């Protein structure tokens, strides 16, 4: 955090996201995997951007359902970081043979509830299993998938809900 401030690569957060960010840091002291659930429009992209900025020297994989959301996160970061790889969920399927080559210290998943879909979920699970020491953070406004009422926090994140704002 201090290093990101001094380098000028700091992402300011509103108080509710600052509280979420502190909860993430506390959560990662006990667990390597967890989630933040916040309502639509509350700034989850900025929360991820802050995490990226604060870990800019480490390898980070960022997954989101589409290019628009990935671009939103990139814009919120505000600067280019060579150690960050941005991928859509579809790329997990399209480039599945490459998933074993993806290496990360941190895996960030925006709109993680989409991984309740079996094909994406299994591809994501491969990436997580191939990076057993990576910290994994998911964000979503809707963690429960309506078909079958699947709780994706329990299914993919060991039930670790670091912060919730609805």
Please state what every model-predicted region is.
Residues 1-35:
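Conserved pre-motif I regulatory segment
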Residues 24, 47-55, 123:
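Hydrophobic residues on the short alpha-helix immediately C-terminal to a glycine-rich phosphate/catalytic loop
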Residues 30-51:
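Walker A/P-loop
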Residues 41, 65, 141-142:
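Conserved H-loop
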Residues 59, 83, 104-106, 132-137:
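Loop/turn-to-beta-strand initiation segments
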Residues 63-103:
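Inter-Walker segment of RecA-like/P-loop motor cores
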Residues 114-166:
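Post-DEXD/H (motif II) to motif III coupling segment of the RecA-like Helicase ATP-binding lobe
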């Amino acid at each position: 955090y201090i290093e990101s401030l001094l380098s000028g690569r700091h992402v300011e957060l509103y108080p509710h996201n600052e509280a979420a960010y502190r909860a993430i840091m506390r959560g990662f002291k006990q667990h390597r995997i967890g989630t933040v659930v916040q309502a639509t429009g509350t700034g989850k992209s900025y929360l991820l951007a802050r995490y990226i900025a604060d870990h800019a020297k480490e390898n980070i994989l960022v997954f989101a359902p589409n290019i628009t959301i990935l671009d939103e996160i990139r814009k919120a970061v505000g600067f280019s970081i060579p150690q960050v790889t941005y991928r859509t969920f579809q790329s997990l399927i399209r480039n599945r043979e490459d998933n074993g080559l993806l290496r990360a210290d941190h895996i960030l998943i925006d709109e993680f509830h989409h991984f309740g879909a079996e094909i994406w979920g299994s591809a994501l699970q491969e990436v997580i299993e191939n990076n057993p020491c990576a910290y994994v953070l998911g964000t979503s406004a809707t963690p429960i998938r309506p078909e079958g009422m699947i709780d994706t926090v329990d299914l993919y994140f060991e039930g670790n809900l670091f912060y919730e704002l609805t």
